[in-house]
Amino acid sequence: MSHTEVKLKIPFGNKLLDAVCLVPNKNIAYGIILTHGASGDMNLPHLMSLASHLASHGFFCLRFTCKGLNIVHRIKAYKAVLNYLKTSGEYKLAGVFLGGRSMGSRAAASVMCHTEPDDADDFVRGLICISYPLHHPKQQHKLRDEDLFRIKDPVLFVSGSADEMCEKNLLEKVAQKMQAPSKIHWIEKANHSMAVKGRSTNDVFKEINTQILFWIQEITEMDKK
């Protein structure tokens, strides 16, 4: 399915956030917000690949850049983007999925758990965490799991089985304790950057994109019933 790229400047305090939307050339119902990790920007190859894949299957996709290591700042920026989409007269979406890579997924999780209590119209439908940074390398005793336990809507984790910032058995234990319906897709032998020895980057991207699209479609199809 064809789509159109639209560049945006989203108000954030006295600043503007750079964003790019991929808008399918048909009636759209659902959108996905994506943002990058501690480094890079919205033009991270994997985010671009994922956005293109989702848009080609009929989903509105917005990527935005918010640089910096201050998680509070990142969370506020994410809230501004979510509010922009929710109040936009141009893109009248029935719902959105919040997503991000690494630090971006941590910001998305925080926004989701604070948004849900006031989300009377169920605008936020789910959370997509790519390489969620559950802990610092070699600091497995300090887990970033508090926000995850407060979320009630569906959550998809896509993580590498060799991720130095997300030990496999620890994420599985967290998922079991979450009140939200959760699913974990492990990319075998992938590290935090989703690099896998012996596999091409595009091959890994394809696996990730396929899993995320399938999960989103499962939820949106249930909404139609």
Swiss-Prot record:
Source organism superkingdom: Eukaryota
Disulfide bonds: none
Short name of one Pfam family: Abhydrolase_11
Protein name: Testis-expressed protein 30
Gene: Tex30
